[in-house]
Every structure is written in C-alpha cells, then in structure tokens.
Amino acid sequence: HLLRAEVDAILVGVSTVLADDPDLTCRLPGMADRSPVRVVSDSKLSIPLASRLVASANDVPVWIMTTNAADPAIRTALQAKGVLVIECLATDDGKVNLDDMLAKLAERGVSHVLAEGGAHMAKALVEADLVDEAVLLQAPGNIGPQGLAAMAGLPLDTIRASARFRQRGETETLGPDWLAKYVRVR
C-alpha cells in the first residue's frame, strides 16, 4: 500500500478487474487521500458497471484506456458514473497499444505508474521494454485455482538475469516469500 501512495497511477488489465474486483486504493492509516489514479487497460470496455472501481470513481479517479472497438453506449454509461474513458490506438490483435497508452497518461501528468496486475499486463510491459523498475514479490505458488505465474509464462529470471536490469539492495525474506527490487540500467 505504501507503493500505491508513492505513484501517480496504478495500472491493471481488465482481466484483473474481472477476476478480483479490486479497490486499488491506499488503505494505510491516514493515507487514504494518497490513493493514485486507478487505470484499467480495457480494449472493449468489458469492465462491469457494478465493479468496485466504477462504483468508487467519484471518490478516487478511474481512467479506462480503451480502443475504438469499445461500445459507445458502455462508454457513456461509464462516463455517467464518473469514469474517464480515454481512447488509445489498438495493436494488430485489438489490444490497447501500450506506448500510446503511456503517452496519453503522460499528457495528463502521469509519469510514475505502478503496474500492479495482472500477469498478462506485466508480461506485455516487460516484452515491450517499458519497465524502468521492477519490484518482484515471489510466493511459493499461484494465487487461486486459476492463478497465473507472475508474468503469464515469462519467467521472473527474465528480469533477474537481464543485462537491462540490476538489483537494488538485498533480497528480503518475508516468511516463505521473497522481495527484490530491480532498476533499469541506463
């Protein structure tokens, strides 16, 4: 939650919203007002109107990054609930173009984004070389019966062994889990 308080925006893919219905707010005592903009990459606007994110959009901003394939009626319904819907370029396979999405976020003053979930989003950002810092928290298994590995089949060693990243500080042991931070080599 402290990481959330230190960034401009939290980014998740719509699959995370559909699976977990997260709040994506900072829930540390006395820091609720530090909750960043909550950003969802959702090419077809499949986020449920009854999701926690949409329901709380007037309290903590929610921006949905979508494509021209999105249903205009759903766009209007989301906007009526206080959600900012931002159209981005689409990739050849119909997903939100990550470079365009980050450029549109930057146009709105967002420069520090925490990509919190899910596995497909993490993998796409790493493969597109759009990660400046990685905080890896590894647990001894997947979460839930349909759980995915942290980066949807892209091994964590992709970052650990990459010449593009170096570890910052020591690996921390947190019970059976471990946490390590990596930064891009400039």
Where are these regions (language model features)?
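Enzymes that bind and transform nitrogen-containing heteroaromatic metabolites
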Residues: 1-186
